[in-house]
């Protein structure tokens, strides 16, 4: 969302100064006054656990870029004092910028996983009722279409039947996206695996549109689990999903990967800010032609892999370069209903549907094939080939 109009509305609500209210204020007093005006126009600010300042749009909480926040604070002070020269002084702006996150700091509240936020309201998944948007749900996203419980997605299902005919594996995909909207701890990363022209990139394009581009991050395994991974991991904050296409990921830290896959608290660091701990961050989908190389042969590493093989090669004569665009333009509400069915199934089963294709692919990744597989199956961890 372009939050600049929202910030402009707050500035416009600041009353013009008079002789009686134009006294010099401390940074804390200015920040407090700005927050009170923001609350009055229903756009309150709050600093979340990731140390970013957010503002409520009326539908969800949006993160304010540091530079834009500085401009806003300068403009707000200039409006309060009718003195833009003083409001533009570096030490004044920096003082407000440092103070403001503390003024609007609130209790760390996680997003409500029993509800999903749509353009036309919030669906309570327990009661199946569509409710009005509330700031107290602390959503940091809104899905970019209305909730429609009767919507269908025939074009999407036809595509899925063509590229991934196995019904159990289709269920796994729906359940994984549905998992985003649950508090379940399932400890999985989804890997879409296979060589080109097999439809997996179309699936990723559709899922990104389904969740909203602004709710997606694009961090690679090697970046998140590498030497400076704390900066890369900071970009997962407030996102629903992280997607990335690594052609051939190099060996990476298995320990950090396991923490991310498990949804455990992870350390992050934004540039020029203190280390923060994330507890609510994106789920993972990686679209790969080759599976990651690893020195970690433990069960704890491999059990976090959910590998969906895309093995159907689509002939050039059948390739429709605009297929994802066609599906996205008409079927997102219906696809979300497919996801909600997967979510319900996931909760009922307390886990993902068993897919023989996924299991076979995981075994091949872990143990290899042929003679190598037979040998690895009898070797203990730490001695596998």
Features from the language model and the residues they span:
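Feature primarily recognizes SF3-like P-loop helicase cores of small DNA viruses
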Residues: 1-50, 77-385
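Trp- and S/T/G-rich repeat-edge/linker motifs of beta-rich repeat architectures
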Residues: 53-56, 60-75
